[in-house]
Amino acid sequence: MSLKVVIPTPLRKFTSGAETVEVEASTVKEVLDNLDSRYPGFRASVCDESGSLRRFINIYLDGEDVRFLENLATPVADGAEIAIVPAISGG
């Protein structure tokens, strides 16, 4: 399935500044695997050593937080859009 991934500004250093990239995948995990194959080091920026999403990273599939779906096993449909959103804290 071909889908669009919206890359946040802090991670664009991996994509040579590209704001969006197209990937082929059937799950969110495959999206991250494919991004890491094309852009080495990408996965380590969004996942911890165990392969889980880092606490401060949110991934949305067509506006739905994948943590409330099937997490990284969430299936993706052709034409879907994934947005990777790093949390911002302040105080």
Residue spans for each PLM region:
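Ubiquitin-like/PB1-type beta-grasp interaction modules and other compact soluble beta-rich domains
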Residues: M1-G90
